[in-house]
From Swiss-Prot:
Keyword Membrane attributed: no
Residues annotated to bind a ubiquinone: 186
Enzyme class: oxidoreductase
Protein name per its UniProtKB record: Succinate dehydrogenase iron-sulfur subunit
Family listed: Belongs to the succinate dehydrogenase/fumarate reductase iron-sulfur protein family.
Subunit structure: Part of an enzyme complex containing four subunits: a flavoprotein, an iron-sulfur, cytochrome b-556, and a hydrophobic anchor protein.
Organism of provenance: Rickettsia typhi (strain ATCC VR-144 / Wilmington)
InterPro entries the record matches: 2Fe-2S_ferredoxin-like_sf, 2Fe-2S_ferredoxin-type, 2Fe2S_fd_BS, 4Fe4S_Fe-S-bd, 4Fe4S_Fe_S_CS, Beta-grasp_dom_sf, Helical_ferredxn, SDH/FRD_Iron-Sulfur
Binding site for [2Fe-2S] cluster: 80, 85, 100
Phylogenetic placement of the source organism: Bacteria, Pseudomonadati, Pseudomonadota, Alphaproteobacteria, Rickettsiales
Keyword Nucleotide-binding: no
Catalyzed reactions: a quinone + succinate = fumarate + a quinol
Key words of the record: 2Fe-2S, 3Fe-4S, 4Fe-4S, Electron transport, Iron, Iron-sulfur, Metal-binding, Oxidoreductase, Transport, Tricarboxylic acid cycle
Length: 261
């Protein structure tokens, strides 16, 4: 009988407890995943007590307060603080989302924060996005048109053609959807995942691009595209309210149409 075991250093252990140093008006406990590969130790869950009466309304505000006032070694990405850049994507209360737009008041009980799942962790809440960006590069996410552009203007679109990009161009590549997808967990070495496939369709749907056939051929692969099993986690978790599953379905339909199906 085959017996499978996780490496001993993959077990998450209880970490440090940072208790309140003074009385708080609105005390709240924040549990944060901590891991530093350079230390060659197990990841831990550290606990911090903070006063929400002296903290901003979003989970990112709580993390910044912890880093500034309690533990400066806590590591996470952040930038815009308004749901535009995608830097602060992480798993909060069991759901992949952006810390900067996740209200603390929406979370009952302790605030539990982990890095995006099924990605190598650089440190603490920082995932390694290298493979994700390599996959993004593979779809050639730029306008491809062999015809010269008009000399005195941009390549124009009709209002109707421009509207076809709504729900696609807004993707901020935060990877919340891809890292919520079981198919991506299992086959991320070959399956492009919902974020990249939505981005691929964004260029396929662009009327200014004349490389549609080649783009579809590049995706016609048992793993790149067809590992999508319509689980729909991607659509449920997208912090921008987009529908990657719909975009993937449209790519599949276009490929079928090319084969006369």
């Amino acid at each position: 009988m085959v017996e499978l075991r996780l490496p001993s250093n993959s077990v998450v252990k209880k970490g440090r407890v940072h208790k309140a140093q003074q009385e708080m008006l609105k005390p709240r406990k924040v549990q944060v995943y901590r891991y530093d590969p350079d230390l060659n130790k197990n990841p831990t869950i550290d606990s911090f007590e903070i006063d929400l009466s002296k903290t901003g309304p979003m989970v990112l505000d709580a993390l910044i307060k912890i880093k500034n006032e309690i533990d400066s070694t806590l590591t996470f990405r952040r930038s815009c603080r308004e749901g535009i850049c995608g830097s602060c994507a992480m798993n909060i209360d069991g759901t992949n989302t952006l810390a900067c737009i996740k209200p603390i008041e929406d979370i009952s009980g302790d605030i539990k924060i982990y890095p995006l799942p099924h990605m190598k962790v650089v440190k603490d809440l920082v995932p390694d996005m290298s493979h994700f960006y390599t996959q993004y590069e593979s779809i050639e996410p730029w306008l491809k048109n062999d015809n010269p552009a008009p000399s005195n203007s941009e390549r124009l679109q009709s209002i109707q053609d421009r509207e076809k990009l709504d729900g696609l161009y807004e993707c901020i590549l935060c990877a919340c959807c891809s890292t919520s997808c079981p198919s991506y967990w299992w086959n991320s070495d070959k399956y492009l995942g919902p974020a990249i496939l939505l981005q691929a369709y964004r260029w396929i749907a662009d009327s200014r691009d004349d490389n549609t056939g080649a783009r579809l051929e590049a995706l016609e692969d048992p793993f790149k595209l067809y590992r999508c099993h319509t689980i729909m986690n991607c659509t449920k978790t997208c912090p921008k309210g987009l529908n990657p599953a719909k975009a993937i379905g449209r790519v599949k339909s276009l490929i079928a149409e090319r084969h006369g199906v």
